[in-house]
A protein has these predicted regions:
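Short S/T/G/P-rich N-terminal loop/turn motif that feeds into the first structured element of a domain
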Residues: 1-50, 55-66, 70-72, 87-133
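Conserved His + Asp/Glu catalytic blocks
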Residues: 74-84
Length: 133
């Protein structure tokens, strides 16, 4: 969770539309991230707008973040995180700074539930493909 640079709220919605379009064009474009679930939320705290990024993925945290940096670099797309206060300007060449920023802004959950806690997203996709055949 992190504070948005004032006036940048529309950038988040535009960026979300870019991701939706990319996934519509190529459903596997985010595959490297091994995502089960991704959710973005904008909300106000004391008159300031904050961004919450919630992702459930199959890799460990550092690998997920490094893969995200790699994905952005390979596609030439910048990250919407550039619109967050304190986000490192050198994130493209400094993955550890990206990881540190995200860890610093991470909020620990006190309850999590997964219907399939020991099954990867890839295994779920395989099972669904088998069922459909």
């Amino acid at each position: 969770m992190a504070k948005i640079i004032p006036g940048r709220e529309p950038v988040f919605r535009e960026y979300a539309k870019k991701i939706e379009a990319a996934v519509a064009k190529d459903p596997h474009c985010l595959a490297i991230l091994k995502l089960h679930y991704l959710r973005w939320v904008l909300f106000d705290i004391g008159g300031a707008t904050y961004f919450m990024y919630q992702g459930i993925f199959d890799t460990d945290f550092d690998k997920y973040t490094e893969d995200a940096v790699s994905l952005f670099g390979a596609t030439g797309i910048d990250t919407v995180f550039e619109n967050l206060e304190g986000f490192p300007k050198d994130w493209k060449t400094n993955a550890p700074a990206f990881v540190e920023f995200v860890r610093k802004h991470q909020q620990s959950s006190f309850l999590e539930y997964g219907e399939y806690p020991f099954v990867s997203a890839d295994e779920i996709k395989k099972a669904l493909a088998l069922k459909a055949s």
